[in-house]
Amino acid sequence: MGAYLSHPKTDKTSTDQFNELLAVGASSMQGWRNSQEDAHNSILNFDNNTSFFAVYDGHGGAEVAQYCADKLPHFLKNLETYKNGQFEVALKEAFLGFDKTLLDPSIVSILKILAGEHNFVDAEADDYEEEDLAELQEESNLPLNEVLEKYKGLPQKKDLDLKSSDHKENFKMRSPYFRGRRAAALAAEATNKAVMDPSAKPDGSSTSAAAAAAALSADGVANSRNPSNVVNPMAGADSNTTTSINDLSTKNAALKDDSVNDQNEGSNGTDFKHTLVSSSNKKLFATGSNDMTELNQSSKNEFTNSSTSKEFERNINSSQDDEFTDDDADYEENDNVKSPDTSSAESSDCTENDDDGDEDGNEDSDEEETDEDQMANDNFCANMIEEPGKDSGCTAVVCLLQGRDLYVANAGDSRCVISRSGQAIEMSIDHKPEDDEEASRIIKAGGRVTLDGRVNGGLNLSRALGDHAYKTNVTLPAEEQMISALPDIKKLIITPEDEFMVLACDGIWNYMSSEEVVEFVRCRLKDNKKLSTICEELFDNCLAPNTMGDGTGCDNMTAVIVQFKKKLQELQSTIPPNQTEDKLLKTSENVSHSLNDQSASKRCASQNADADDEILEKNNSKRLKTDLEQENIKDRTPSPSNQNEDPTQKAIKEVTIIVSSS
């Protein structure tokens, strides 16, 4: 699971649009998550009599979802197959082709800006360790008040010297203990409410998609020359690591009190928190203002150390032993995996029999295999390249409505559902690693699916845009990689019975079924509520009261509701009716009913056969009884051998024969 806030952010970003054919309401809510990683499109006038709707659910950071919302519609529109009206082929080409562009260096640089990595480059762990160990030693001799001043984020002489040398291209974050993945959560939070020129993005794009142009504008050039203008997640973290380990326990209390006071005096009452998460070992999460400027100011004036001194010391000790990073914010791992102690088992085998020894050997073998899988998963995640688009990605469910023809392309576990006279028609399939088709592809590509349904212990979905760390098998095409961007395509002709469709991320579908969502929306449409208001009420209904459960109701939530108007029926349709999802479902149901009938017939035949078998068994029983009686008669006939038999023994024998025959 990802990091959670102490209180959910329930403010929503909502829009309502309409034309003569459609009415659309969309909304998104951050919820309990540390940052908002969803994005969406709602483009009514995408093309002539054509609309485009999409929901992108990001993981490992918001940058890929934001970039998709900003660029994917135009990418699709420029394809020759789209221009030729081959929409099904065009959607597949768009997903696979757009996913490939995420490896382009120029695109990666844009993703880095979205992820908050501008002017930050990775370096080897040894370089960081040498610098920080030296600084730790130096800071251990400083007076306490100077250390506390640095915790407050006040500029010191070293900081001024660093700013004077900011023309160096390879500016590095100085602490290996806070290096983590990158501050994707911070970037998503900072850019969530950015405003972009409407001409630079598709109409109807979600507000989170604005970050690309905003970051590439004036700030992009200025930030490349002045790191002080960049949101630096290390503002308070640097000085935290430079405190002597021996002084941590005595300084932590004073630091905490000072931090709380500073927090209360922060601008606009916003909090800016850096939290060390011990389970992910150097993972950095941030929460605070959505405004980039406020984050810059608060990072200088506010810092709350929410990790205990024990947690901090444990992070330092573990960092000295090894370097380890997770693949995304949704991935949790067990840092204390131990190899099974086989020595005691071997010694005990000497006193047990061979069978017990075999059982112990099997148990040890199972444990070793489990540990080997765990180690392989850990190594995969530890060696994952920390770069946007490689260790981050997004699901995508895209709806292209051309006339009355609806094409739905889906990769991942977001979903699209149509309400036809109150009945839910699912227009997408959730792609999960444990599914037979998905698991087969993952294993063929060299991956593993864990018992909790994760690919190599990381992602809990099997198709997505981005995540190129899982797409490195050079012998296989893109659509056959562990994580594939190939979408499933479903088609439908909109009829007068079709009322609306709902696109939403798994934050909704993990809590409510398709039928429940359809009924929820229908009830509120009868009350003439705005579509965006219905989305907001849907979020409130799904929101968990706390984060103590299994994570259901704690995710980001995004939904788009599209209501079909009567005039839409005047438009033409070109999809062959026998290829639409409703017809395929009906055919599938007929086949299912036929199989059920055959099964019932077999059961009926089986019952008759059982009856015949019962009659046959009774007849056999009668024959057996007759044979036994004849044997009894023979036994009762005196013979020379038993004429002198003892009467008592003879009586016992007769009773035994009678009982056996009955």
From Swiss-Prot:
Modified residues (Phosphoserine): S289, S306, S592, S594, S599, S639, S641
Region (Disordered): 219-275, 288-374, 591-662
Bias-annotated ranges (Polar residues): 238-252, 261-275, 288-319, 337-347, 591-609
Sites where the protein binds Mn(2+) 1: D57, G58
Residue ranges of domain PPM-type phosphatase in the record: 23-564
Compositionally biased residues, Basic and acidic residues: 616-637
Annotated residues for binding of Mn(2+) 2: D57, D506, D555
SMART domains noted in UniProt: PP2Cc
Catalytic reaction equation(s): O-phospho-L-seryl-[protein] + H2O = L-seryl-[protein] + phosphate; O-phospho-L-threonyl-[protein] + H2O = L-threonyl-[protein] + phosphate
Pfam families found in the cross-reference section: PP2C
Keyword Metal-binding among record annotations: yes
Note describing how the cofactor binds: Binds 2 magnesium or manganese ions per subunit.
EC code(s) of this entry: 3.1.3.16
Cofactor(s) in the UniProt record: Mg(2+); Mn(2+)
Biased composition (Acidic residues): 320-334, 349-374
PROSITE patterns named among the record's database cross-references: PPM_1, PPM_2
A GO term, aspect molecular function: metal ion binding
Residue numbers bearing the Phosphothreonine modification: T637
GO biological process, any: signal transduction
Recorded family membership: Belongs to the PP2C family.
Name the record gives this protein: Probable protein phosphatase CG10417
